[in-house]
Amino acid sequence: MRKSGKRNLVLALSAAMTMGTVMTAYAGPGAQPGSSVSTSSGVITAGQGQTQTESGGPGAAGSGSFTQNEPGQTQQETSPSQPINQPSETVPVAGALENGVLLEKTIGNNNQITNLSMKLNGVDGAISYGVYVNNGGYLPWKGNGVAAGGTESTTYIEAIQVAITGEAAKHYNVYYRGTSAYAGQHGWACNEELMGTVDRGDYLVSLEVVLMPKEAGAPGTYERRFFSNHSEYIRIAEGNTTYTNADGTGYTGWVDHDRARYYFQNGKAVTGWNYIDGMKFFFNENGALIMDVDAHIGKQDSYQIRVNKELNCLTVFAKDGDNGYIVPVKAMLTSVGDDTPLGTFQTPEKHRWRFMVNETYTQYATRIIAGQGFLFHSITYETANPETLITSGYNNLGVTRSLGCIRLTCANAKWIYDNCKIGTEVVIYNDASSPGPFFKPHQVWIPEDQTWDPTDPAFAGR
């Protein structure tokens, strides 16, 4: 996967812009200065800025203060009091696919990227992206030209993840890097890896994305791909991950770093099974929390399902003997509705296929409340045929849009259908402060013309 290889297919995205600008890179003429930029999903307006058209290659490189650690250690980086890196001229890339992507960004103060969208152009498939912003953390993933980020000038993007699906994903890996105002240019991230900074007061000022053939390697170094406010203190190593406070003492508590979660006791990460905060967790050899322990514990006699309506996700819990349901098993992304009820219920029945009130069908339906129409179920279909998926429902998992049911991917709906007996307790609650003991899952978008759920086991290997 990371070898030198053939011609690379490039989606070159750069934010070499001035304050208050929406930038578009695509095949075709740009909008006139001062106008809005239309996409298939709506309009992004730049206020007093202007729309520019760009095609080409990578954005600027930066020169932050950087210390290379010994092998096995985490890279360290220090930031000056003022931003030192700004976007520069786009540099063409040999072998690039000209105008391979439609890119739109809104640029705020100090060249901050406040929101962005991407769309594949001339390549079959879909591209999706999730961003971490200063005033909202990790936002729901978007894709296929839908804007991700903030709508106000006080929002800026600190980090990003990118993924491709469909035919594009069969032949290419997606690599991406950017420049942060303080940290400088980051190394290349690949296929959903996190790139940028988190909680350091830094922000992206440029971005580039490259599609590389599966047999080819990365277009450059991976060094300095990501920094968090823990980067200077955490050292990740098998069986010996440590976290040292600034004063040299060992840290005790939870740490989230690079989309992984750790728990430290006196500076050393715990491994294996541990009771923490009233729950029982499993950690791997590096100390990273395992956020799906289904394969480790096997099918249980009973489960409890806790649905966070506010944040559109749920966590399945298993029983730990007399301690009750304190073992988080897995998290699932949901799409609830305004009418989804709060409270504690017991599931009364299941349906392999179910005809819905809006004349659609759904798979693996588990009723939540006896005598009422609220169900756990897959995304809806036009007919009782798994190749008639309503794609918009799949791509909007994580968004409140059902009539009150709790929508899931086919795989997750099937897991509940197969594993949770009639009478399973379901707790539906609101908590905007935390999705639960695990991270909120994200959903990579699928192409708009794909009418089957990629998680459906009926299409395994397709």
Where are these regions (language model features)?
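Extracytoplasmic/secreted proteins, especially bacterial periplasmic and envelope-associated proteins
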Residues: 115, 159, 206, 329, ...
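Exported/periplasmic cell-wall-interacting domains
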Residues: 355-462
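Gram-positive cell-envelope targeting signals
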Residues: 1-36, 40, 160, 207
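A mature extracytoplasmic/lumenal domain signature
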Residues: 122, 133, 166, 213, ...
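Lectin-type carbohydrate-recognition ectodomains
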Residues: 28, 34, 42, 47-49, ...
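Extracellular adhesion/carbohydrate-binding repeat motifs centered on closely spaced tryptophans
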Residues: 21-22, 26-30, 84, 96-97, ...
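Ser/Thr/Gly/Pro-rich low-complexity, disordered linker/stalk segments of secreted
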Residues: 29-88, 452, 459-462
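Gly/Pro-biased beta-strand-loop elements
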Residues: 296-388, 461
